C-alpha cells in the first residue's frame, strides 16, 4: 500500500470561517494555487498550479488508486477540493485525516499546536509565516492606490513571497507526515476510521434550508431590533443602549447599586425585583429581548447556505476529543433553542409572510418566537420528509449499565420513569404515589435535579448550577439530596472511586486495571516520544490522556492531571481530573459509540442521515406509504442491542415531518 501525503493552498472570495468549506469551494472563483505532495515519505514536491504547472500524471492516477492511501491534515478539505478538481466524488475509504488521528490521541485540531504538543523539532514544525502569506494570496485584497486598485494578489505581485509560500506548502506536508509518524504508535481502529468516512458523506449531503423562513426572520428581527433600540434610546438617552458598559452605568445611576455585568441570568434576576422603576424595568425587558441570539443563527445559516439551498459541514468528527463526540460548526446545531411555540406551522407562515403585527399579537415576544423557530429553518428536500429519532435518557442508561446499578436498569427495561424512580429510592416512597394528583409528586422535582446533577460526583454546587434553587428547593435541603442520591446509587458512587484509584495506580505503577467494562492503562512509546493514560471502552475505542501525572490536590489527596486543551482559554496546558469526571468522559464516550453504531446501521438500511445532535439523528428521505412504519423502522434500528454492551437497555422515540423541531 502506497501513501500519498497532500497539502493544498487555495483561493476563494467566500470567507471559509463563516461560510464553511463546501460553499468556499463552490465559489466560481475558487482555485487550487499550490499542491504539495510526498509519496511514501519522500521529500515533498510543490506543484505550482497558479503559474501554470500541471499535476504529474502519476499523482492524478494515485488520487483514484485504491492501493494508495491519501493523507492530509484536515483531510475533508483536501478531499472536497480534489473531488471538484477530479470532477467526481473521491472514495472516502482511500483517505486518512491526520488531524482526526491527533484528536483521537488527545491532541488539538491545529497543525502547529499539535506539532508543538508532540515536541516536533524545529525543522519538522509548521512555518510561522503562513498566516500572513495566506492573507496575501488566498483571500481578496482591498483595492487601493498603492496596489493599483486590484482586488487580488497574484504570484507576480510578490515573487519572493510566492517562493516563501511554496516553501510553506511543502513544509506543511513535512509536518503532517512527522505527526502521522509519531501517532503511528496509537492507530485509529478500523471501525472508527469507517465512522469518519461516513461522517464525510453526511457532511457533504448537507441539510435543506427554508430560505423564505430565514429571510423573513432576518427582516422581522432587524425591524424589531431597530424599534427596541429606538425605544431604549428614548428612555435612557444613551447613544448606544446595546453597549454593556453604557447600559450598566445607566442602571447603576438609576438604581444606586453596583451592576456586575449584564449576563442573561443577571438580567433575569433584576427583572424579578419589585422595586424597579418603570424605566429600569422596561430597559431590562428590552435588554432581555435584544439579548436573544435568534438572528445570529439565521445570519449564520444565510452565510453558509450553498447554491443548491443546502448547508454543509455542520458537524466536526471528533470535535470534542475528550470523548470523541461530534462538535457543531457554522450554525452550531448542537445548541439550538427548543421549540415550545404552538402552532409552529402558523408561526412559520407569519414569519415567511413578514406579518410582524400578527406574530406579535398571537405569540407575544417576536425575538423569542424567532429564536424558537430556528430549528424549523432546516427542512426536508422537495418531496421528502424528515425522520427524527433520539435515544431516551442515554447517559442515565449508560452510567447505570457501566456501574451495574440494577434497580436503575430495571427502570429502563420497564416504565423508564427514572425521575420518579430515583425519588422513590431516595425518600423511601412507593413510586405509585409519585404522581400529579398526590402531594408526594413534589419529590419528583428533587429526583429530577439529582439525576441531572449528581451522576458524575457532583455535590451541592452541581445542584445549584442545575437550577435547584430556581425550582424552589431550599439551599439547606441540598446536602440531604446529595447524600440520599449517593446512598440510593451506591454502585455509581463506588464506580467514581474505583476509576480514580485505578487511574492513580496505572500512572504511578504502570500496567493496566479493569473497572467494570473499561480498562485503564499507562501506555508509552519511547521511540515516538508519546506517553498516555488510556481508557479502553467496551467498543474497543480508546480515550487518551497525554503526559499523565499524579500530584496533590487542595485536600491533600492524590490529584490526577494530564496535558490537554483548556476549553476556556483554548491553550494547551495541564488539566486536573478525578474519578467522577473520568466516569463522565466514559459515559459520554460510550453513548457516542452507541450513536455512531446506530448511524452506521441506518446508513446501511438506506436511511440517509443529514445531521445529528448528541443523541438524536435526522434523516431526509422519500416518504414510505406509512409514516408510522418509517418511524418504527428507524426506532428499531436505534434501539438494537449493542454487541459490545450486553444488557444495556437502549430505547428511542421520534417523529416524521417536513421541518426540524424539538418534539
Where are these regions (language model features)?
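A short acidic-Thr-Gly-centered motif at the start of a beta-strand
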Residues: 1-2, 60-64, 369-385, 600-604
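Short active-site loop/helix that positions an aromatic residue
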Residues: 12, 76-88, 105, 248-253, ...
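Active-site-proximal helix-loop-helix substrate-binding element of RNase H-like nuclease domains
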Residues: 27-37, 41-184, 196, 342, ...
Amino acid at each position: 500500500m502506497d501513501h500519498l501525503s497532500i497539502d493544498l493552498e487555495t483561493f476563494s472570495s467566500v470567507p471559509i470561517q463563516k461560510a464553511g468549506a463546501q460553499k468556499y469551494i463552490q465559489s466560481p472563483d475558487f482555485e487550487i494555487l499550490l499542491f504539495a505532495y510526498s509519496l511514501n515519505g519522500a521529500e515533498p514536491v510543490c506543484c505550482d498550479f497558479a503559474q501554470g504547472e500541471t499535476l504529474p500524471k502519476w499523482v492524478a492516477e494515485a488520487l483514484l488508486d485504491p492501493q494508495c492511501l491519501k493523507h492530509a491534515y484536515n483531510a475533508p478539505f483536501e478531499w472536497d477540493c480534489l473531488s471538484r478538481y477530479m470532477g467526481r466524488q473521491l472514495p472516502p475509504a482511500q483517505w486518512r485525516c491526520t488531524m482526526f488521528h491527533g484528536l483521537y490521541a488527545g491532541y488539538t485540531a491545529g497543525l502547529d499546536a499539535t506539532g508543538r504538543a508532540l515536541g516536533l523539532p524545529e525543522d519538522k514544525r509548521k512555518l510561522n509565516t503562513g498566516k500572513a502569506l495566506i492573507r496575501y494570496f488566498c483571500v481578496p485584497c482591498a483595492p487601493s492606490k498603492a496596489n493599483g486598485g486590484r482586488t487580488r494578489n497574484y504570484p507576480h505581485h510578490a515573487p519572493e513571497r510566492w517562493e516563501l509560500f511554496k516553501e510553506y506548502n511543502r513544509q506543511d506536508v513535512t509536518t503532517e507526515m512527522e505527526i502521522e509518524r509519531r501517532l503511528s504508535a496509537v492507530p485509529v481502529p478500523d471501525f472508527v476510521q469507517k465512522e469518519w468516512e461516513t461522517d464525510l458523506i453526511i457532511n457533504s449531503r448537507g441539510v435543506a434550508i427554508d430560505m423564505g423562513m430565514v429571510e423573513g426572520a432576518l427582516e422581522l428581527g432587524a425591524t424589531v431590533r431597530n424599534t427596541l433600540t429606538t425605544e431604549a434610546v428614548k428612555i435612557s438617552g444613551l447613544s448606544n443602549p446595546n453597549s454593556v458598559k453604557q447600559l450598566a452605568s445607566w442602571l447603576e445611576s438609576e438604581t444606586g447599586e453596583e451592576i456586575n455585568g449584564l449576563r442573561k441570568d443577571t438580567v433575569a434576576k433584576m427583572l424579578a425585583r419589585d422595586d424597579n422603576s418603570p424605566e429600569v424595568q422596561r430597559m431590562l425587558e428590552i435588554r432581555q429581548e435584544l439579548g436573544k441570539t435568534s438572528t445570529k443563527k439565521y445570519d449564520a445559516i444565510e452565510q453558509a447556505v450553498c447554491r443548491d439551498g443546502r448547508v454543509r459541514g455542520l458537524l466536526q468528527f471528533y470535535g470534542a476529543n475528550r470523548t470523541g463526540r461530534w462538535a457543531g460548526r457554522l450554525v452550531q446545531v448542537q445548541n439550538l433553542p427548543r421549540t415550545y411555540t404552538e402552532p409552529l406551522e402558523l408561526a412559520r407562515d407569519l414569519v415567511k409572510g413578514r406579518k410582524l403585527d400578527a406574530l406579535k399579537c398571537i405569540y407575544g415576544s417576536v425575538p423569542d418566537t424567532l429564536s424558537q423557530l430556528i430549528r424549523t429553518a432546516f427542512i426536508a428536500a422537495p418531496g421528502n420528509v424528515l425522520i427524527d429519532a433520539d435515544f431516551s435518557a442515554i447517559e442515565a442508561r449508560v452510567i447505570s449499565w457501566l456501574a451495574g446499578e440494577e434497580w436503575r436498569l430495571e427502570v429502563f427495561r420497564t416504565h423508564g420513569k427514572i425521575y420518579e424512580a430515583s425519588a422513590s429510592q431516595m425518600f423511601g416512597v412507593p413510586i405509585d404515589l409519585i404522581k400529579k394528583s398526590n402531594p408526594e409528586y413534589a419529590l419528583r422535582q428533587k429526583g429530577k435535579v439529582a439525576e441531572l446533577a449528581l451522576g458524575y460526583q457532583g455535590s451541592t454546587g452541581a445542584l445549584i448550577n442545575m437550577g435547584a434553587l430556581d425550582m424552589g428547593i431550599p439551599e439547606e435541603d441540598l446536602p440531604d439530596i446529595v447524600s440520599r442520591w449517593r446512598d440510593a446509587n451506591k454502585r455509581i458512587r463506588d464506580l467514581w472511586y474505583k476509576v480514580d484509584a485505578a487511574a492513580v495506580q496505572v500512572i504511578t505503577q504502570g500496567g493496566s486495571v479493569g473497572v467494570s467494562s473499561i480498562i485503564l492503562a499507562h501506555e508509552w512509546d519511547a521511540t515516538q516520544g508519546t506517553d498516555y493514560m488510556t481508557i479502553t471502552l467496551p467498543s474497543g475505542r480508546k480515550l487518551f490522556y497525554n503526559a499523565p501525572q499524579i500530584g496533590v490536590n487542595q485536600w491533600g489527596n492524590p490529584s490526577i492531571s494530564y496535558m490537554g486543551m483548556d476549553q476556556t482559554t483554548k491553550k494547551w496546558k495541564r488539566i486536573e481530573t478525578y474519578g467522577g469526571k473520568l466516569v463522565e468522559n466514559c459515559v459520554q464516550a460510550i453513548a457516542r459509540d452507541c450513536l455512531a453504531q446506530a448511524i452506521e446501521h441506518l446508513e446501511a438500511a438506506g436511511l440517509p442521515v443529514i445531521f445529528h445532535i448528541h443523541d438524536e439523528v435526522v434523516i431526509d428521505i422519500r416518504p414510505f406509504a406509512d409514516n408510522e412504519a418509517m418511524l418504527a423502522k428507524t426506532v428499531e434500528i436505534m434501539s438494537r442491542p449493542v454487541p459490545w454492551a450486553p444488557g444495556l437497555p437502549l430505547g428511542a422515540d421520534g417523529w416524521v415531518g417536513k421541518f426540524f423541531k424539538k418534539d
